[in-house]
Amino acid sequence: MGRQPCCDKLGVKKGPWTAEEDKKLISFILTNGQCCWRAVPKLAGLKRCGKSCRLRWTNYLRPDLKRGLLSDAEEKLVIDLHSRLGNRWSKIAARLPGRTDNEIKNHWNTHIKKKLLKMGIDPVTHEPLKKEANLSDQPTTESDQNKENGHQQVQVVPQSTNVTAAAATSTEFDNNSSFSSSASSSENSSCTTDESKLVFDNLSENDPLLSCLLEADTPLIDSPWEFPMSSTTTVEEPKSFDSIISNMTSWEDTFNWLSGYQEFGINDFGFDNCFNHVELDIFKTIDNVENRHG
């Protein structure tokens, strides 16, 4: 809820005060003193609100009120208070007896602010304006100098030198990359060859066939191969050719059953229905030729 209104707005007079209203308000306050401003209009016989009575007394009718412009001492005090309090005019007016906050604010905006600007002082921060101007000009001057230097460098350095420098850097980069790649590939190949040599050496030591194939001097064909034998194996003496032949049976004894079937022809096995006349004639001629030579 907001503040309650000081009076009923019905029947309240607005606008400038008359001389009769000023006399009634002055006589009431001088005889009764300052009291609740909401009750003053009814007690003094005025058709005004309490706020209007208070402002009229404070700003225009009180006896200690000073008229006219502020003195030099008052202006210095206002500047000092404004640097510490800012635009809190009511607090500044409390330090200046006989002066109202509205009067001090009007005097500040019309007179004191212009004096401070002429003196080169900022009326808001109360600091010299030259320092701020110098600080604001420094980055602009530095940027302008950098732009000018960069423009001069671009004009002095020709375009061909930039191209050649870029080409030189690119060729150096390519050479370095190719050298590093070749070095890495050679290292990898050397590592793989060393590993393969170790593997082949181990295999050749364990396997006589591989050791024979990997030898620089080829061995004679007639030289016997010596394979590793375990301790449990026994070496048999070589047998003579006559003993091998005597143990073998004759071909006739072994394949005696085959000679009995040599006399059969194709018709005996029932193949006459499987072949045509031409094929049968071929088989007959083959049999006749074999019988002749046999």
Curated annotation (Swiss-Prot):
Q: Which PANTHER family match?
A: F14D16.11-RELATED
- Gene Ontology CC annotations of this record: nucleus
Is DNA-binding included in the keywords of this UniProt record? yes
**Where found in the cell?**
Nucleus
* Function (record text): R2R3 MYB-type transcription factor controlling the production of volatile organic compounds (VOCs), including floral volatile benzenoids and phenylpropanoids (FVBP), in flowers of fragrant cultivars (e.g. cv. Mitchell and cv. V26) by regulating the shikimate pathway, via the activation of several genes (e.g. EPSPS, ADT1, PAL1, CFAT and CCoAOMT1). This scent, mostly produced in the evening and night by the petals, attracts the pollinators (e.g. the night-active hawkmoth pollinator Manduca sexta).
DNA-binding region listed in the record: 37-61, 89-112
In which broad location class does this protein mainly occur, judging by the first location in its UniProt entry?
nucleus
Alphabetized InterPro entries for the sequence: Homeodomain-like_sf, Myb_dom, Myb_TF_plants, SANT/Myb
Residue intervals of the HTH myb-type domain: 9-61, 62-116
Cited Pfam families: Myb_DNA-binding
> What keywords would UniProt list here?
Activator, Biological rhythms, DNA-binding, Nucleus, Repeat, Transcription, Transcription regulation
Q: Which organism is it from?
A: Petunia hybrida (Petunia)
Q: What happens when the gene is disrupted?
A: Reduced expression of genes involved in the biosynthesis of precursors from the shikimate pathway (e.g. PAL1, DAHPS, EPSPS, CCoAOMT1 and CM) thus leading to a lower accumulation of volatile benzenoids but seems to not affect the production of anthocyanins implicated in flower color. Increased levels of EOBI.
Which BP terms in the Gene Ontology apply to this protein?
chorismate biosynthetic process; circadian rhythm; green leaf volatile biosynthetic process; regulation of DNA-templated transcription; regulation of gene expression
Q: Does the keyword Iron-sulfur apply?
A: no
Which residues does the annotated region (Disordered) include?
128-152, 171-191
- Give an example GO molecular function: transcription cis-regulatory region binding
Give the highest taxon in the source lineage: Eukaryota
Tissue and organ distribution:
Restricted to the petals, with the highest expression in the limb, probably in both epidermal and mesophyll cell layers.
The family database entries (Gene3D superfamilies) matched by this protein are listed as: Homeodomain-like (1.10.10.60)
Q: Explain the induction of this protein.
A: In fragrant cultivars (e.g. cv. Mitchell and cv. V26), increases before the onset of volatile emission at the end of the light period, peaks at night and decreases when volatile emission declines early morning; this precise expression regulation of its promoter is tuned by EOBI and EOBII binding and activation to a MYB binding site (MBS) 5'-AAACCTAAT-3' and by LHY binding and repression to cis-regulatory evening elements.
Q: Where is the signal peptide?
A: none
Record-given protein name: MYB-like transcription factor ODO1
